[in-house]
């Protein structure tokens, strides 16, 4: 399937999701990002399959973030799509800190597609977490450089890679170059099996570039069952990296 056809399918699914969510009473989702993330999962299961970060994977990521010490303050997401995972990151941070989340606790999520950005912003606003989750339009590498230059991102506690797999490694290495990782930082990469990110996998499984004083990675893979029934069920690896500087 060509990228153009894939883009059309994504656009159609996003439009259908918007209609599905906003046809329901706003009170179902106001100030409740978990309910909204759950509704997106339900839509994908029942109305039209979408390439979202599924609940089974999210549960693993949530467990890691909830246990992280010190508690996470800055999360980067490369690839917003419709915003399901961004909603979840914001919800997790609110679960950690309570209703009064400190101003320096933020999720920055990046996507070059204006339709996806608009939808994600509307969903984040509906869920009442727009003070935590910032949906930014453009290539993640460019935006991260700007945020770093502006002093808005000084360290990264977790980075989530769920965009085009060919950019996983360059964007991981950009975080290294900007010296944003700390000991105990977490990186999560989705879809490392299919379509696949072989260069990224080789790099992180080798522990990094191997030079003295560089970031070193410890990787752990998980397999989760896709929730689409026994016929189409399959295992999906989720790669977590634990940074030791």
Predicted regions and their residues:
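N-terminal auxiliary segments of SAM/dcSAM-dependent transferases
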Residues: 1-33
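C-terminal substrate-binding/active-site "lid" region of AdoMet-derived donor-dependent transferases
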Residues: 165-245
